[in-house]
């Protein structure tokens, strides 16, 4: 049960620990602390982005001003997260201390870094296009949403709690399909060209796979009423 918390401590103190994959054999609840921290971080980023870079009041008309804002925000967050971890793990003054923690002692090549960063950036553009489409549907009234969180408090809380599990199921399902036949050969194999994974590798995917991956947002966004909390663009 303490495995995730112990690893968080080891990362903070640069304790190399042991090179084992023992976490994979543990019970599902052993990963809850790490999962909670990860999900809470993503939720915080989402709320911050929504509060300051979500111009729903302008989204009824497709125009470059607000669409470029969405793209710039997603690219900036991506480079901050992945680029920040990349710098910390491979270019900062702590690299030597963390080398002993690597399962693969070899560092990724510059060619792989460029490959992963390029396809991740393409992914940020696809992510932005999907978000822009959803925003436009909300703003034009073609998809239902409500502004008052307390209008349906139980539904609002349940929806926020359900979405991470839906995302995990969606990822599990599509990942199984992507490892089959033609989809693997022509689509998913690009992701597996990251032979020595780094922070940029997770989002380094073929555009088709990226589109399928972010399609997880379509089910909750298009088929369930959404709560849009007032932000700096809409205060009523």
Where do the model's predicted regions map?
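Non-catalytic, topology-defining segments of multipass membrane proteins
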Residues: 1-173, 177, 186, 194-221
């Amino acid at each position: 049960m303490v495995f995730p918390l112990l690893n968080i401590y080891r990362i903070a103190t640069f304790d190399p620990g042991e090179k084992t994959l023992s976490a994979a054999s543990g019970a599902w609840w052993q990963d809850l602390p790490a999962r909670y921290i990860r999900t809470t971080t993503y939720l915080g980023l989402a709320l911050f982005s929504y509060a300051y870079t979500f111009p729903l009041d302008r989204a009824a008309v497709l125009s470059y001003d607000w669409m470029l804002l969405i793209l710039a925000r997603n690219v900036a967050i991506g480079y901050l997260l992945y680029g920040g971890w990349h710098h910390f793990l491979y270019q900062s003054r702590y690299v030597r201390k963390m080398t002993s923690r690597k399962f693969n002692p070899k560092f990724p090549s510059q060619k792989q870094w460029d490959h992963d960063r390029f396809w991740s950036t393409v992914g940020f553009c696809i992510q932005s296009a999907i978000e822009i489409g959803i925003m436009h549907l909300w703003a034009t009234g073609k998809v239902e949403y409500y502004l008052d969180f307390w209008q349906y408090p139980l539904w609002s809380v349940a929806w926020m709690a359900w979405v991470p599990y839906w995302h995990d199921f969606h990822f599990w399902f599509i990942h199984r399909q992507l490892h089959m036949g033609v989809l693997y050969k022509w689509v998913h194999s690009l992701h597996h060209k990251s032979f020595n994974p780094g922070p940029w590798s997770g989002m380094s995917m073929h555009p088709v796979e990226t589109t399928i991956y972010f399609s997880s947002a379509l089910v909750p966004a298009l088929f369930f009423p959404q709560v849009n909390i007032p932000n700096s663009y809409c205060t009523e």
